[in-house]
């Protein structure tokens, strides 16, 4: 069968054609639900505010294997820079182009196709298969996976293993899987001063001048050494804003946004304590608020990682490399429940970019990998 005609290719194209920019779903989950319902899944839509979510499950017993992912995509950017319209899926030289091709409608299609094949071969499989799908992963992530997990936890419905379809691969399909993620902590700091005329600095109090030594010291601090699974904790200033835009006005306040990506060697509480101790040492007048974006998690050796290694080796012929690098994913909301979480998806070279694309052959291989993982865990 030509790669263009693979069922996974056709389903990916159907999903790409739905312009589901966050928090819109545009019928993607309905399309998936129709396919899953036909093979015995119970479909439970969960709509919270502007976000569409779906919890689908086949089986009533444990262990529970869950495919997790998102139907929403980031905006297209300048459409004139695309080779083809971003929501008109187009195959050129073996690559399928379209917004969401790699992140992550190709993965969603591969999950559905793999599950259809697995159920056809193993209708009486062990345990349960589930899908946790949201339309709010690329956005504020308030009403998506975290709300679904809250609902499941309230009724004591547990996930044993979760496979997130984020584009984990770097150079070729399956060369990297993500078996953990760093924690993410954001600080929003306001340093207070007194606004005034630049010609009369004795009548004002410049918060930029006051904050500069603090920020310099903060940016040079050593937080930890990392460990065998995580790099050292990193600190980055993301935004600074102060002043009125006029050259003759000393600002009355300085706003600074910064972010930590932290390892399991520290906790959010430790980072907060160190920052606030330094603020007090510099005798700054300040307000600060914190946003907890996610705790660090790690899935070590065990059934899920073992099954994934076997699947990638069997389908591609090479060994995968588990890593914890990169940004956060919705896995951070699933892991605190006790579930083991891994991420396996397409090559991430074009995600969020103009002309996002995925290799058509990789979609079929990804579906095969997912199918082998199901066989390893539920047969």
From Swiss-Prot:
EC number: 3.5.1.18
Annotated coiled-coil segments of the chain: none
SUPFAM superfamilies, per the entry: Bacterial exopeptidase dimerisation domain, Zn-dependent exopeptidases
Pathway this chain belongs to: Amino-acid biosynthesis; L-lysine biosynthesis via DAP pathway; LL-2,6-diaminopimelate from (S)-tetrahydrodipicolinate (succinylase route): step 3/3
Free-text comment on the cofactor: Binds 2 Zn(2+) or Co(2+) ions per subunit.
Pfam families: M20_dimer (PF07687), Peptidase_M20 (PF01546)
Ligand binding (Zn(2+) 2): 103, 138, 352
Catalytic center residues: 72, 137 (proton acceptor)
Catalysed reaction, written as an equation: N-succinyl-(2S,6S)-2,6-diaminopimelate + H2O = (2S,6S)-2,6-diaminopimelate + succinate
Binding site for Zn(2+) 1: 70, 103, 166
Record's function text: Catalyzes the hydrolysis of N-succinyl-L,L-diaminopimelic acid (SDAP), forming succinate and LL-2,6-diaminopimelate (DAP), an intermediate involved in the bacterial biosynthesis of lysine and meso-diaminopimelic acid, an essential component of bacterial cell walls.
Family: Belongs to the peptidase M20A family. DapE subfamily.
Protein name: Succinyl-diaminopimelate desuccinylase
Organism: Shewanella baltica (strain OS223)
Phylogenetic classification of the source organism: Bacteria, Pseudomonadati, Pseudomonadota, Gammaproteobacteria, Alteromonadales
């Amino acid at each position: 069968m030509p790669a263009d005609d693979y069922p996974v290719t056709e389903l990916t194209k159907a999903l790409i054609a739905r312009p589901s920019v966050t928090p819109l779903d545009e019928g993607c989950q309905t399309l998936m639900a129709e396919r899953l319902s036909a093979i015995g899944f119970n479909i439970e839509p969960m709509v919270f505010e502007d976000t569409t979510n779906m919890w689908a499950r086949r089986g009533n017993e444990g262990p529970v294997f869950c495919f997790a992912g998102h139907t929403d995509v980031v905006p297209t950017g300048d459409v004139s820079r695309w080779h083809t319209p971003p929501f008109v899926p187009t195959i050129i030289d073996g690559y399928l182009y379209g917004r969401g091709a790699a992140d992550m409608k190709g993965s969603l299609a591969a999950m559905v196709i793999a599950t259809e094949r697995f159920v056809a071969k193993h209708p009486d499989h062990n345990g349960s298969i589930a899908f946790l799908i949201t339309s709010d992963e690329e956005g504020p992530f308030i009403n998506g996976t975290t709300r679904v997990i809250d609902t499941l936890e309230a009724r004591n419905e547990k996930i044993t293993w979760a496979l997130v379809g984020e584009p984990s691969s770097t150079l070729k399909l399956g060369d990297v899987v993500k078996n953990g993620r760093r924690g993410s902590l954001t600080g929003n700091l306001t340093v207070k001063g007194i606004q005034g005329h630049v010609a009369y600095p004795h009548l004002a109090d410049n918060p930029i001048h006051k904050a500069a030594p603090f920020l310099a010291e903060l940016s040079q601090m050593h937080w930890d050494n990392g460990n065998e699974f995580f790099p050292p904790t990193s600190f980055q200033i993301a935004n600074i804003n102060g002043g009125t835009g006029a050259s003759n006005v000393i600002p009355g306040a300085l706003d600074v946004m910064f972010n930590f990506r932290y390892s399991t060697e520290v906790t959010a509480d430790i980072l907060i304590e160190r920052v606030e101790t330094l603020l007090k040492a510099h005798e700054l007048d300040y307000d600060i608020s914190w946003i907890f974006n996610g705790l660090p998690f790690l899935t070590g050796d065990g059934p899920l990682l073992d099954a994934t290694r076997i699947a990638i080796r069997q389908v591609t012929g090479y060994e995968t490399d588990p890593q914890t690098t990169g940004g956060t994913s919705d896995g951070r909301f699933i892991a605190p429940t006790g579930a083991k979480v891994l991420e396996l998806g397409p090559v991430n070279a074009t995600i969020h970019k103009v002309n996002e694309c995925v290799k058509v052959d990789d979609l079929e291989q990804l579906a095969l990998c997912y199918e082998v993982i199901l066989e390893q865990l539920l047969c």
